[in-house]
Amino acid sequence: MEMILGAFGLLILWIILTKRHKKQSVIIEKPVEYLFDIVGEQSYQANLRKIAGPKQEKSKYVEVMARVISEPFNAYDKNAIKIEINGLTVGYLSRDDAKLLAGKVINQTVPALINGGWLDDNSEGSYGVKLGIQSLNELI
């Protein structure tokens, strides 16, 4: 009887282990392309510095997640769409891009890249932000 229970236990263990291995699959993600420019980053350099750190001799490339949010009560543009990283405003979609999304509630989190922020003996570069989206439709 003990041999039957032992064999039965081994069979169950084998089934569990083979199912576990079948569930594991390799997911190959294509790299994110940061092609979508935003505007207004110059006004938010202090916030970008808090996120990316102080300027260094070479440009920085910091991958982050950004929140893209409608801002219908914006005093300057009722269609404004704000970009936040770590809860800090870092810029906006351009007026033309925001106008294309007018009337839609936008609240998405997307990959983003903070780039620039160099300081050397000859020049200094501001931080910029690019979103990892291919089109505005990804925000709807």
Q: What is the meaning of each model-derived region?
A:
Residues 2-140:
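Conserved active-site motif detector
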